[in-house]
Swiss-Prot record:
GO terms for molecular function: glycine binding; glycine dehydrogenase (decarboxylating) activity; pyridoxal phosphate binding. The glycine cleavage system catalyzes the degradation of glycine. The P protein binds the alpha-amino group of glycine through its pyridoxal phosphate cofactor; CO(2) is released and the remaining methylamine moiety is then transferred to the lipoamide cofactor of the H protein. Signal peptide: none annotated. Keywords: Oxidoreductase, Pyridoxal phosphate. It catalyses: N(6)-[(R)-lipoyl]-L-lysyl-[glycine-cleavage complex H protein] + glycine + H(+) = N(6)-[(R)-S(8)-aminomethyldihydrolipoyl]-L-lysyl-[glycine-cleavage complex H protein] + CO2. It comes from Bordetella avium (strain 197N). GO terms for cellular component: cytosol; glycine cleavage complex. This is Glycine dehydrogenase (decarboxylating). The lineage of its organism: Bacteria, Pseudomonadati, Pseudomonadota, Betaproteobacteria, Burkholderiales. The keyword Membrane does not apply. The gene is gcvP. The glycine cleavage system is composed of four proteins: P, T, L and H. PANTHER family: GLYCINE DEHYDROGENASE (DECARBOXYLATING), MITOCHONDRIAL (PTHR11773:SF1), GLYCINE DEHYDROGENASE, DECARBOXYLATING (PTHR11773).
Length: 955
């Protein structure tokens, strides 16, 4: 009877696609007796776990969510006026429900395949247009990670672009303190001297300048003359700014800024204890080819119709590697989409109205605190006031706490207050009465009808140019309009809610609804990253427990959850290695060995950390070439800092010699960085911290179920062994500053990075338990081997382990087809769209191949559907091989086929329309139609347009 009363966890079979019966069939197909037997063939015995994970067992969804709700309740939701780059905002409910909570948006991958990504590309183009418009600059990228890292990227962009030969980057002391700290961290590995000072005292000789507009503590300054002075000495002017303020302020591009950066957080994205939020960067046209991050551009498709794509990809790490403009890979696409849609929803008039209201409320507050006898130190302001509270400061802060209000504590005698769009007249009265109480005075009754505050914007800083002039920002008149616009965009895209996304090295697994629910709870969403510690106990418990679980899973001793992408985790790990060597007096250790097959972020991150990259060859089996490794270690001698490897390898196999590789590097005085991108093949099976690695980053947006969001958000924790723990990223205090004892600076603007989505992996781990996590790994490996076995007859599987097995992904070699009849991996990738599939990873890690990772979440029926599609495509290739179809005019070369193509009055192709549209009978049920034909990449780069086209272009 007692068992009947127990809550039952049925999550594991809902997360894992194949049933136990299907698993048995699949094991029989690949010739293996059990999952345990499969692991024995795949995972080298020397690295396999000898004991199960010391984690609790699986639990039910109601139990886990109830516990998390109790944890969240330990956070205190105060009224926040801290500002400092983070502001209260209203997420439009139509965007909350139909974008943030919609798997059609949050389960998509980065739009590298533009033909099936036109919806989110259009939404990102809206975002880029919005940012470029508000900043008054020529071009904007499609998001960066946060304001602090965007400022750091601005510094490196300025270094690449400036005429000045100086190594000094001047940072205004009026910038947000967390931005200053992140910039300082980034500069350390790049031989850049950061000088923080007061720009009103004149500029030193420098290659770049970073200003804050408006100031962190509220002031608004006309920087036109300063920009002219900087340009006169060959320096680049960067400006960290506030998009809402720019609805009223002269845009930076008009007063001389070359680069503008910031965060779009206050455009509809809650605090989330620091993230995720979309950073932005805009710049002058002359800088576009040096700009970091992804860039959406307008091109045309094979039919001559407008089509969107990621432009100028040769700047990026996946192509340029250590010569890339940045190591950024995952950005903040989902949040950028939300911010762009916030602008579409409100339109130019609505945005001005919000900005004017915020500014007016700040003026009302200024009048009343001055009437109380306090001094407001900034005469100019947009939304923030610096108030000298003198000896009354402790009493004011006590009164604020009693009223559940957070003020920004600047120093012993001053506080700052930032107004946002959520502030009401009642809120304003409560805020004013906090100051009255602190001064021992009676409450004031606010009469909104009689208020007439003076404007706080000085001459020369008031915007005269229009905002959001493109028709898209005036097209939505009702929620019905918005709802249909969002549906139209979503219908253009292919995400996990439609079909599997078999991208190798990307781990596109289920993002379960139960995992997503907590991120919108107010107790998590409405916590400011610099709120006092006694208000964030729930978050701290979440962080501690998730950190402990991840350390148990990986075998490391300590972890930082601060990095807000995998690339940032890599960077943080390499900074830890750098700090460790320098603390030991081994400053000469600055060479990072990286296999030729490594992810592009690896060499890009090494370069940012101040290391030189030396490439190690791979052997014919896809493993690290031990002879070449030995030679390179001898060649670099005592300059060896680290080896970066991915495990299992990017070739989709567990290298048998990984422990020997680690031992050789350690013997030479180096450290081993193991890229955790493929951790989905090791959870519960092997612990990198126990078989020789010193540091790894994890991708919580891969292995631990944070959704990819169409290209972000992500979380890339960095886990280390004990000797590297002192060199993990520094955690900023409540003032946004780095404590003196920190050995390494922060890599993200918020103390715990994108803390607002950490509940997702916590829920996943809790629901799966130790046994479920291991089973997920086993089935991920089973699914990959099933696909490899079934397709090996049709496409060569390029690499396999000692027993002929792959790990959690497999590489299909398309090069023989390219050589014999000109059919490329790209042709097959585009043809898969006609079958309703996103392509596997193309040409990585080997050019001319397709890398398939099915993950554990795909069931046998979906695997068979993909396999059937690949077999059918191979039959179409055979038609070309036999001469039955033309080498240029065939279903592969012309793929994907749009409805417009197939409904044209004339059909000039040698194959029938039926074959183009419905190559398999199953496609007649729920056919996905690509909205555009194959996109012309070269045309888009030659004719770069990165803002919304006039509406006539789509007619």
């Amino acid at each position: 009877m007692s068992r009947a009363l127990d809550t039952h966890s049925d999550f594991i079979p809902r997360h894992i696609g194949p049933s136990e019966a299907d698993q048995a069939k699949m094991l029989a197909t690949i010739g293996c007796s059990s999952l345990d037997a499969l692991l024995e063939e795949v995972v080298p015995p020397r690295i396999r776990n000898q004991a199960p994970l010391a984690l609790p067992g699986a639990r039910s969804e109601p139990d886990v969510l109830a516990e998390l709700k109790q944890m969240a309740a330990r956070n205190k939701v105060f009224r926040n006026y801290i500002g400092q780059g983070y502001y209260g905002t209203h997420t439009p409910n139509v965007v909350l429900r139909n974008v943030l909570e919609n798997p059609a948006w949050y389960t998509a991958y980065t739009p590298y395949q533009p033909e099936i990504s036109q919806g989110r590309l259009e939404a990102l183009l809206n975002y880029q247009t919005m940012v470029a418009d508000l900043t008054g600059l020529d071009i904007s990228n499609a998001s960066l990670l946060d304001e602090g890292t965007a400022a750091a990227e601005a510094m490196t962009l300025a270094r690449r672009s400036a005429k000045s030969k100086s190594a000094v980057f001047f940072v205004s002391q009026h910038c947000h303190p967390q931005t200053i700290e992140v910039v300082r961290t980034r500069a350390q590995g790049l031989d850049i001297d950061v000088l923080v000072g007061d720009e009103s005292q004149g500029l030193p000789e420098c290659f770049g300048v970073l200003l804050q507009y408006p100031h962190s503590l509220g002031g608004v300054v006309n920087y036109r003359e300063l920009a002219e002075a900087a340009h006169a000495q060959g320096a680049v002017v960067a400006c960290a700014t506030d998009l809402l303020a720019l609805a009223l302020l002269t845009p930076p591009g008009e007063w001389g800024a070359d680069i503008a950066v910031g965060t779009a957080q206050r455009f509809g994205v809650p605090f989330g204890f620091g993230g995720p939020h979309a950073g932005f960067m805009a710049c002058r046209d002359a800088f576009k080819r040096n700009m970091p991050g992804r860039l959406v551009g307008v091109s045309k498709d094979a039919q001559g119709n407008p089509a969107l794509r990621l432009a100028l990809q040769t700047r990026e790490q996946h192509i340029r590697r250590e010569k890339a403009t940045s190591n950024i890979c995952t950005a903040q696409v989902l949040l950028a989409v939300m911010a762009g849609l916030y602008a579409v929803w409100h339109g130019p008039a609505g945005l001005r109205r919000i900005a004017t209201r915020v500014h007016t409320f700040a003026g009302v507050l200024r009048q009343h605190v001055q009437a109380l006898g306090l001094t407001v130190e900034n005469d100019s302001y947009f939304d923030t006031l610096l108030i000298n509270t003198g000896p009354a400061t402790p009493a004011v802060l006590r009164a604020a706490e009693c009223a559940h209000i957070n003020l920004r504590r600047v120093d012993a005698g001053r506080v700052a207050v930032s107004i946002d769009e959520t502030v009401t007249v009642e809120d304003l009265q409560a805020l004013i009465n906090v100051f009255a109480a602190g001064l021992g005075k009676d409450d004031i009754t606010l009469d909104a009808a009689t208020l007439a505050p003076e404007a706080g914007l000085p001459a020369g800083t008031v915007r005269t140019s229009p905002i959001l002039s493109h028709p898209v920002f005036s097209s939505v008149q009702s929620e019905t309009d918005m709802l249909r616009y969002l549906r139209k965009l979503a219908d253009k895209d292919l995400a996990l809610d439609r079909s599997m996304i078999p991208l190798g090295s990307c781990t596109m697994k289920l993002n379960a609804t139960a995992e997503m629910i907590p991120i919108t709870w107010p107790e998590f969403a409405l916590i400011h990253p610099f709120a006092p510690a006694d208000q964030t106990a729930g978050y701290r418990e979440l962080i501690e427990r998730l950190s402990a679980a991840l350390c148990e899973i990986t075998g490391y001793d300590n972890i930082s959850l601060q990095p807000n992408s995998g690339a940032q985790g890599e960077y943080a790990g390499l900074l830890a290695i750098r700090g460790y060597h320098q603390a030991r007096g081994e400053h000469q250790r600055n060479i990072c060995l990286i296999p030729s097959s490594a992810h592009g972020t690896n060499p890009a991150s090494a370069q940012l950390a101040g290391m030189d990259v030396v490439v190690v060859a791979s052997d014919d089996h896809g493993n690290v070439d031990l002879d070449d490794l030995r030679a390179k270690i001898e060649q670099v001698g005592d300059r060896l800092a680290a080896l970066m490897i991915t495990y299992p390898s990017t070739h989709g196999v567990f290298e048998e010699t990984v422990t020997e590789i680690c031992e050789r590097v350690h013997a030479a005085g180096g450290q081993v960085y193991l890229d955790g991108a493929n951790m989905n093949a090791m959870v519960g099976v092997a612990k990198p911290g126990k078989f020789g690695s010193d540091v790894s980053h994890l991708n919580l947006h891969k292995t631990f179920c944070i959704p990819h969001g169409g290209g972000g958000p992500g979380v890339g924790p960095v886990a280390v062994r004990a000797h590297l723990a002192p060199y993990l990223p520094g955690v900023l205090n409540e003032q946004g500053k780095l404590d003196a004892e920190a050995k390494v600076g922060p890599v993200s603007a918020a103390p715990y990075g994108s803390a607002g989505i950490l509940a997702i992996p916590f829920v996943y781990i809790s629901l799966m338990g130790a046994e479920g996590l291991r089973r997920a790994t086993e089935v991920a490996i089973l699914n990959a081997n099933y696909v490899a076995t079934r397709l090996r007859e049709y496409y060569p599987v390029l690499y396999a382990g000692r027993h002929g097995r792959v790990a959690h992904e497999c590489i299909l070699d398309i090069r023989p087809l390219k050589e014999s009849i000109g059919i490329s991996a790209e042709d097959i990738a585009k043809r898969l769209m006609d079958y309703g599939f996103h392509a596997p990873t193309m040409s990585f890690p080997v050019a001319g191949t397709l890398m398939v990772e099915p993950t554990e979440s795909e069931g046998l029926a979906e695997l068979e559907r993909f396999i059937d599609a690949m077999i059918a495509i191979r039959a179409e290739v055979a038609q070309v091989e036999r001469g039955e179809r033309d080498r240029e005019d065939n279903v592969l070369k012309n793929a994907p086929h749009t409805a417009q193509m197939l409904l044209a009055e004339e059909w000039h192709h040698a194959y029938p329309r039926q074959q183009a549209a419905y190559p398999l009978a199953s496609l007649r049920d729920g056919k996905y139609w690509p909205p555009v034909a194959r996109v012309d990449n070269a045309y888009g780069d030659r004719n770069l347009v990165c803002s919304c086209l006039p509406i006539e272009a789509y007619i």
